[in-house]
């Protein structure tokens, strides 16, 4: 038996991109299931520390580099030098779900992914915006529901778990996750990191 991660690395060094894509899909589904199981006991599996946003974002983009290149995505990353305090692996997973969602729903000849952060008096905001198919206004209030894929999203083989898990984990980490979208134009997700507080996981 060969671990899925090892298979993925093997295909990185070959031209068998079709097999690699299918392996990546399996890996992502398994990852979602594992994090779903672990999300019930986040307090037993977290380590809050100072994180440089640029390093975390770089690693997530690197993780999806093949898919981003395949879709010929124009990536605009700027102003991400801010520091936040949270758990690195959970934040990496949340960002991975958001970027993965963006890749699934790109539908333009010129696909764009924009990532930046903002610093205000009380929070650090991390914004991830794509110019994909967007979300219908009637669906927007339900995107964080478990299993909800929306009427625009069936074609992408969506599981309805990515944004649900992202929201759930943000809540557990004391972060806020906001979404804004216009159908056929864009989707923007904003992770809000409160300054100067450490979340109590017993809440």
Model-derived features: where do they sit?
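Short beta-strand/loop element within the Bergerat-fold HATPase_c
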Residues: 112-122
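Short alpha-helical segment of the dimerization/phosphotransfer core of two-component systems
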Residues: 21-26
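Acidic ATP/Mg2+-coordinating residue in the GHKL
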Residues: 130
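Short helix-loop "hinge" at the ATP-lid/N-box region of the Bergerat-fold HATPase_c
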Residues: 102-103
